[in-house]
């Protein structure tokens, strides 16, 4: 079956408007804008849940902060004690880095510089 050029053009002329009509219905645009105040029941519930979780973890955060501060104070005190031990007039005093104490070379006992 031979299709002539004019039949092809006629077929194209028929199919082109059909294709355009289908493509415009498929690609319909919406120009609707929804504005929410952000004060919905769901957002209030979500905020309440976040606040409850924050309060529940507050005790844990406080413990972590206290532990960190305590460790920092311990390191700071050890640094000060090391300086005092090294500057001590006692020639038998030496700083033990593993135990973070000032010891007497002869007896191995803790001394206060």
UniProtKB/Swiss-Prot annotation:
Signal peptide: 1-28
Domain of life: Bacteria
Record's keyword annotation contains Signal: yes
Keyword Isomerase: no
InterPro entries: DUF1283
Keyword field: Signal
Pfam families: DUF1283 (PF06932)
HAMAP family: UPF0482 (MF_01581)
NCBIfam families (UniProt xref): PRK13659.1
Family recorded in the similarity comment: Belongs to the UPF0482 family.
Protein name: UPF0482 protein YnfB
Organism taxonomic ancestry: Bacteria, Pseudomonadati, Pseudomonadota, Gammaproteobacteria, Enterobacterales
Gene: ynfB
């Amino acid at each position: 079956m031979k299709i002539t050029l004019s039949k092809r053009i006629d077929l194209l002329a028929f199919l082109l408007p059909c294709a355009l009509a289908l493509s415009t219905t498929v690609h319909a645009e919406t120009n609707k804008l929804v504005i929410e105040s952000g004060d919905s029941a769901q957002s209030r519930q979500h905020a309440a849940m976040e606040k409850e979780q924050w309060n529940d973890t507050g005790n844990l955060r406080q413990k972590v902060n206290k532990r960190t501060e305590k460790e920092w104070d311990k390191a700071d005190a050890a640094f000060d004690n090391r300086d005092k031990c090294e500057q001590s007039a006692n020639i038998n005093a030496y700083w033990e880095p593993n135990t973070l104490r000032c010891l007497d070379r002869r007896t191995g006992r803790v001394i206060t510089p």
